[in-house]
């Protein structure tokens, strides 16, 4: 499945992008005056191949898994919180769940590696094992397990497509996963440890220093093939990160627009884009995460955050917010009149199309 997807991803529909841009420029407004909404609408058309789109059926896919490195004391919460919060996703009481309910967004929650035998009703069970190994002592998983995590993410998109979802978000739950994400990002781009390690959910200074030391050491000790994103996941990543990477790959393959949440989500998007550089064309950002490594990762991906709300929750919480903005972009494209439809003579625009200036109607 994985190789088929990697080879089967095609780029945006450039003919439709040109048509969509011409449509946007013909709308009864000063050129470019709706800013990023115009860019969003145009790229959405390039993804779907349709001039007019709607995202009335929305879903955040959440990958839950435990990380063995938690036993090193790098997280503020105990490991049992992964299972508890996964249950709360289903109850609708977490941050992402309450935001999602406000604009009709559904959640699709997967157990890819929670350290528990408990079966949670409403959670899709794709458990690879009960948590990864402690990356401070040994590789997180085997190479085959890493590939399996990616394929679970791809399968999740296939399920979402069959259910009729028109836009996806990518979230997670896994105590310790800011540590694994920081290690993955450091391995991917070769940066300083201090540039990628933050305090995650909130840890004291001693734990923070330990977290930085662990990330520094694990990237050196496991004989990582830095040119192979799957090997990076297997050595220092997590099942959650791998499955999220698969969601981004699947979204590009099935041509469904997909929204990046925060730090862990953007690291997964970057991994997917390293596996196939067309992936980022299908990605929309949401918010600028306050977790320190986010800025490096989004810059490496070549995208800009849509919003800056001082958020750092994770879970996919930024995705429903971005869905609303994307909804506004589709409303503009679908419902706004052109100059011709509004009986407005737009000949005055000919003098300014190639100049950097603004016109107030």
Curated annotation (Swiss-Prot):
GO molecular-function terms, A-Z: nicotinate-nucleotide-dimethylbenzimidazole phosphoribosyltransferase activity
Active site: 315
Family: Belongs to the CobT family.
Function statement: Catalyzes the synthesis of alpha-ribazole-5'-phosphate from nicotinate mononucleotide (NAMN) and 5,6-dimethylbenzimidazole (DMB).
Coiled-coil spans in chain: none
Keywords: Cobalamin biosynthesis, Glycosyltransferase, Transferase
PANTHER family xref list: NICOTINATE-NUCLEOTIDE--DIMETHYLBENZIMIDAZOLE PHOSPHORIBOSYLTRANSFERASE (PTHR43463:SF1)
EC category name: transferase
Protein EC: 2.4.2.21
Pathway: Nucleoside biosynthesis; alpha-ribazole biosynthesis; alpha-ribazole from 5,6-dimethylbenzimidazole: step 1/2
GO terms, biological process: cobalamin biosynthetic process
Pfam family for this entry, one: DBI_PRT
Alphabetical list of Gene3D superfamilies matching this protein: 1.10.1610.10, 3.40.50.10210
Identification of the protein by name: Nicotinate-nucleotide--dimethylbenzimidazole phosphoribosyltransferase
Designated gene of the protein: cobT
Catalytic activity of the protein: 5,6-dimethylbenzimidazole + nicotinate beta-D-ribonucleotide = alpha-ribazole 5'-phosphate + nicotinate + H(+)
UniProt keyword Glycosyltransferase, yes or no: yes
Keyword set includes Disulfide bond: no
